[in-house]
Amino acid sequence: AADALLDSSSPDPPSGADGLLLLADGTRYRGRLFGAPVIAEGELVFTTGMTGYQESLTDPSFAGQILTFTWPLLGNYGVHSGASESAGVWPRGVVCRQLMEVPDHRDSIGSVHDLLFAHGVPGIQEIDTRELTRRVREHGTVLCIFGPAEAEREMLVRLDEMTPPDAEDLVAEVTCDEAVIINPGAVDKEGKPLPRLAAIDCGVKHNILRELAQRFEVVWCPATTTFDEILKWEPDSFFASNGPGDPAHSGAATTARDSLAAAVRAGLPVMGICLGHQLMGLAAGLRTYKLRYGHRGANQPVVDLETGRVYITSQNHGFAVEDPDKGMLAPHPSGACSARGRNELEAPFKVRYVNANDRTVEGLDLIGKRAFTIQYHPEACP
């Protein structure tokens, strides 16, 4: 896990090091640096969670991004063994109002500064995150860079030459290396073998795998694994996980989408969450598009259109599936979206869930197939 790399020899936060955060729109903020002594660049996003910062920092869905925490204090209870969602820290940089440099919890094994330093990730504090978040909400996510104030000239050049992380094959960066059964021979309470599920890893979190392993014998597969290769494991069902980046990217995500579509056509049970939901939407012939500022936090309300019930969900995504009737809701000013394709699933579908805030699509049901999707993270871990 990410916390396994904590090193008590990491230097104290450089309290006197002046930092500079530069946005592509020309806005600048001054603060103090912590974490690794390197320059960070990426897409500026924010998360509204009040706790769960360790889980967010180790969530592969944040790959390629500069993560702003809207809650004004970061690191109060330190870093805990077993709380990480992957083996890495995935944001390329962290922005906060105030860092708790000496955490206060009996089970803490280190600080956020220690965790970031161990993984080569920088942070900047004393930023007006309230104003910064309002700017992102009003104008959309934006490219940014931060580092030592004396490196301003270098950072301006790099910011001018920066390409959006969405253009990168981020799924290939975060997926596992090879297929493996994580709980071989798993049985239920009566000793009967559990059904086998192929979990396509687009950036899956550990808590999702743990939940699946309580119900299935799980084959953990790289996103680059083809449908025919997965079939060699003789799965009873398919699952596609959360993950970072543009679902329409022509890399590992495309291979995962093709595997899902083939599984649906073969009549196998299929579930997609977060990026997996978006890949299924693309396979259904819908467009995916970039949201103005995305949904990132543990308090996103989702409406079940069949029952009228509202669920408070944990989410982390910057893209959405278009509504087949209403089109693209809450889009990014850039207008970034995929082309509309054909329905590769060979089945009609309906929108089952929508976001109560902006009415964007939060889940699809495939009619006549054992397949469905949800945009949120059902294990409810930030």
Language-model segments: what does each one mean?
Residues 309-368:
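Catalytic beta-strand/loop cores that center a nucleophilic Ser/Cys/Thr
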Residues 122, 196, 269-271, 287, ...:
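Proline-centered loop/turn at the N-terminus of a beta-strand
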Residues 363-382:
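A glycine-centered loop/beta-turn motif at secondary-structure junctions
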Residues 232, 237, 242-323:
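Cysteine-nucleophile active-site neighborhood
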Residues 1-233, 245, 254-255, 379-382:
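RNA-binding accessory domains that recognize and position tRNA/RNA substrates
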